[in-house]
């Protein structure tokens, strides 16, 4: 395995200042950031809020510089003290699953940003179609790729699997062993990462940016194993031919999709998936599926489909999942009703509709688009969000 030099051992002050400013500039209005800057600058919370509202954040840079100095010294001396993470249970609005979310202090979020910035060279290991939580990728990239792959008639079999408790099941010892194996030098970066993830209750913390990138980097081992190492050798009439068992792979964080040309290749891919995941210390749910895309027992062309990233991909069309479609239709109808009654559209409803319209852009639901005047509805919702973002809330507001 090729080792990567990070070129950033957090020795220089700018290795800390650049990510800290990137993090703070995205969080000026947040209550925890306001309280931290008020404490560092000796001002009141109300004064800091007023400076942010008047776009005078340059007056707070002296407090940011003090934070950077303190963080840099704590990293150099490897002496880190952080407030405990606060955990709470939250129901996932789409799947209704209960998830344990850890809310980190703003200080730990800054250290996460520093560690994540130092890991930039290691992110090159992440596979091309590992699309979750990565800038420039996401559902749009996965949608374009799957639309292209499904039109290829050579792709006949699909394998779908899911990692059980992806964040919480990550073995921190194996993760750090992997990082020490692939990272050349940079002991301070490894110490900082190990110290930060040791504060998590089980495995890695859900809702932490550093956790997202560490999971993507760790699962890249599985991605490259399946797409580059699982080969099929065919011998016929004295000729030897070799091809990869997996012709296309898509990882949406813990959701795995493998596309193959034959049932034999699909079985080989499943075997490699289960073996490599066990080696990495992660568990694949027993509900994994292997199915034929051109199933002759299903009448009609295009009746079999791939269901991932909230969209059903048929051979020559795409549609939303039923429950997503119903929610999108209800949200659009509610906004249309409020517009006709000349009533205010709540910001929560506007955000939900904008999200659903983003999914509709990937599909061929033209009748829905025309019936609910989606273009006009989207413009109204964007105006609501734009107005909402200009309101300055108190420091403790959520």
List each language-model region with its residue ranges.
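Beta-rich nucleic-acid/ligand-interaction surfaces
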Residues: 133-142, 249, 290-298
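Right-hand nucleic-acid polymerase module
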Residues: 109, 113, 224, 231-240, ...
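Inter-domain linker/hinge segments that demarcate the starts of reverse transcriptase
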Residues: 67-79, 266-281, 328
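Short, conserved non-catalytic motifs in the polymerase core
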Residues: 53-55, 83-110, 126-137, 197-217, ...
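Conserved polymerase palm-domain catalytic core
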Residues: 74-75, 148-274, 292, 305
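Non-catalytic, polymerase-adjacent accessory regions of viral genome-replication enzymes
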Residues: 1-73, 389-398
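Active-site-proximal segment of RNA-dependent polymerases
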Residues: 111-171
């Amino acid at each position: 395995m090729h080792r990567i030099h990070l070129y950033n051992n957090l020795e220089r002050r700018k290795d800390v200042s650049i990510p800290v400013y990137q993090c703070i500039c995205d969080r000026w209005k947040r209550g925890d950031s306001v309280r931290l800057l008020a404490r560092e600058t000796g001002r009141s919370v109300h004064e800091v809020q007023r400076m942010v509202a008047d776009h005078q954040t340059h007056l707070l840079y002296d407090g940011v510089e003090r934070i950077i100095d303190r963080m840099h010294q704590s990293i150099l001396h490897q002496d880190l003290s952080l407030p405990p993470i606060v955990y709470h249970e939250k129901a996932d609005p789409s799947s209704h699953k209960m998830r344990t979310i850890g809310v980190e202090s703003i200080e730990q979020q800054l250290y996460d940003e520093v560690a994540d910035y130092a890991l930039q060279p290691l992110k090159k290991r992440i596979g091309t179609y590992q699309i979750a939580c990565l800038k420039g990728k996401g559902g749009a990239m996965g949608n374009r790729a799957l639309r292209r792959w499904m039109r290829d008639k050579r792709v006949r079999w699909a394998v779908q699997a899911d990692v059980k408790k992806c964040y919480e099941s990550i073995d921190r010892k194996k993760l750090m062993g992997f990082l020490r194996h692939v990272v050349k030098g940079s002991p301070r970066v490894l110490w900082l990462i190990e110290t930060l993830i040791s504060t998590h209750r089980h495995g890695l913390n859900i809702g932490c940016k550093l956790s997202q990138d560490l999971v993507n980097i760790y699962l890249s081992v599985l991605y490259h194993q399946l797409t580059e190492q699982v080969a099929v050798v065919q011998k016929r009439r004295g000729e030897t031919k070799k091809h990869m068992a997996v012709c296309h792979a898509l990882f949406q964080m813990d959701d795995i999709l493998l596309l193959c040309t034959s049932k034999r290749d699909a079985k080989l891919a499943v075997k490699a998936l289960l073996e490599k995941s066990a080696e990495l210390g992660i568990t694949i749910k027993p509900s994994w599926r292997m199915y034929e895309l051109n199933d002759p027992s299903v009448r009609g062309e295009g009746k079999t489909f791939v269901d991932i990233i909230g969209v059903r991909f048929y051979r020559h069309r795409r549609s939303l999942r039923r429950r997503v479609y119903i929610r999108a239709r209800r949200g659009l109808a509610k906004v249309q009703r409020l517009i006709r009654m000349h009533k205010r559209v709540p910001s929560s409803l506007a955000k939900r509709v904008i999200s659903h319209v983003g999914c509709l852009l990937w599909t061929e639901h033209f009748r829905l688009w025309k019936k609910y005047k989606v273009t006009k509805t989207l413009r109204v919702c964007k105006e609501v969000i734009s107005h909402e973002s200009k309101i300055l809330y108190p420091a403790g507001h959520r």
